[in-house]
């Protein structure tokens, strides 16, 4: 990517610049001053968050800023700069896989050792990380393995001295090469590490050995895995800054490439080790670093489990019941359907002007009219339109092709003279009837016409409404057949009583004698 005028003017200033990775789908690089990326280095909350996981989500960053009064853009820039300095470049799959491991071991700060490389210059260890086997290299990129130990002995931490950058002419031809993510090997590792440790921009890092850090600082010789994530907008720029071809170790370096030699802590020079192919990733930390003292998990990091599987809420859940009711399609009136059907009998494929005229006449929204025509054509094609067969003119094709809609122009002229349908009357209102009933409890004949106008009901409907309010009379059921049977049954009983009375009288007479 060729430097523009703004970047050239920024490079001419005394402050160091950092070219951060792309942060959007358009792969726009971010140029920022090195002071802005290091002004938050002393914030313990950010250090602890980066030690826990170097790829926090936007929700985690927002929660950090809300709790500790920080600016979100500065915090995002700080995290990008830390990953750039530490040589961290993961794909989205690697981020999710490592995030799951970190959440599982959330009582440890697994990335604490990376922070020591960020703010301090280190001397080269006695034993370098082993080379990845070829079969692992062929598999491509993979996240940092947290289970494979690596010997990191002889590590001495010293405070990093502020660096001075000398301005040299830039080789624009080298820098104008296109951005190629994950397609070339990293040809010069010392150049990459100077960029990581000192925070130089791409143009400053490519200006020669004079633009690197002071002689007392050593470059940590990593092999960086560069890959463009599919989903995460935080893409590393190391491939773009390190893609220049390195010169042979015996020839003097050019003005656009840094020196192929490394300056060690004791002042001696050493040639770089053979270049590792793309996909090589440094192994994990030593067991002593993994056995850190248990730390309390930050509160913001507890949301990592929820952020890994974002919840998806349907759009209808955010709508109120009134909004959902409005979204429902209203039923078309008989007049509207009659107009649509009469037009469909003449032309099955309406034009834009026809839709506009139908929209004015029927008062229906345009999407509903278009949907009705599509559904009606589908039903006609499958022989499910009886009213069309009954009303179709003889000689008219049953299904008209849109390419030969000759009657559309004629129908447009006819429909242009059709007046729009009158507005539908408002619905009846029975509240005046209820108020009248509550006040009088009885309907007067003089008030029938007045109530009919107020409620928009006919006089008969008003009478029926008041009749429904009147109390219903009690129902009396008379069964004549049952009564006659009961009378017939009662007659023999009366005869028996008379006979008994006569017998008693006879007995009385006998006793008297």
UniProtKB/Swiss-Prot annotation:
Modified residues (Phosphothreonine): 418
Subunit structure: Homodimer or heterodimer (Potential). Interacts with HOXC8.
InterPro entries for this protein: HD, Homeodomain-like_sf, Homez_homeobox_dom
Record location of the Glycyl lysine isopeptide (Lys-Gly) (interchain with G-Cter in SUMO2) cross-link: 156, 174, 176
Pfam families the record matches: Homez
Protein species of origin: Rattus norvegicus
The protein's name in its UniProt record: Homeobox and leucine zipper protein Homez
Nuclear localization signal, short sequence motif: residues: 327-332
